[in-house]
Regions:
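HIT superfamily nucleotide-processing domains
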Residues: 1-186
Length: 186
């Protein structure tokens, strides 16, 4: 029950200069909700590696866009943007330095083709490429090496993730997989 007084008038705002650390030009995007996803990989009920299981499925069921000799490309089940691809070796290795020269070459070649196909099919304006190796580095599946290819557009960030805790993805994963797989060179 309110007594009618304006309690906001008594509130003070602490300036950023009062916090620990040295101010810099970087903005921070704090995502503590991702810790549940990151730490879930360490629990015993996650016995099957999703990147070892995917190639055993049909391309449609595994969301696989393309298969090479030593590596393959699939859609991220939890995409940052529509068309978010992952390039994985078939072998279950956890770090880039464990990859053979053949795997390194094919991961690189599949990444290049993936970028070209995404640019052609989605008209993206840029990419984020990267590998998070180890849970401490933010890898959701830290036991199996995978490279992210995230297509970017100048307008892909909006208020939804901040206000509504929702990421707007305009295409269903199956539709994206079909589009990219059909555009992939044979």
């Amino acid at each position: 029950m309110s007594d009618g007084r304006d309690t906001d008038a008594d509130a003070s705002v602490t300036g950023s200069d009062a916090f620990a650390g040295v101010p810099d030009e970087f903005q921070r995007l704090w995502t503590p909700h991702r810790m549940a996803y990151i730490q879930a990989g360490r629990e015993p009920h996650h016995e099957e590696c999703p990147f070892c299981a995917a190639p055993e499925k049909s391309d449609e069921d595994g969301l696989i866009v393309a298969r090479g000799r030593t590596a393959y490309v699939l859609l991220n089940l939890f995409p940052y943007n529509s068309g978010h691809l992952l390039v994985c070796p078939y072998r279950h290795i956890s770090t880039y330095d464990q990859a053979t020269p053949e795997e390194v070459a094919e991961i690189g070649a599949l990444t290049q083709v993936g970028m070209r196909v995404l640019r052609e099919t989605s008209r993206c304006e840029g990419f984020n490429l990267g590998m998070n190796q180890g849970a401490v580095a933010g890898a959701g599946v830290d036991g199996h090496l995978h490279q992210h290819i995230v297509p970017r557009w100048s307008s892909d960030a909006n208020f939804f993730p901040i206000i509504a805790k929702t990421k707007a993805l305009p295409q269903l994963l199956g539709d994206v997989r079909r589009t990219l797989a059909s555009a992939w060179p044979r």
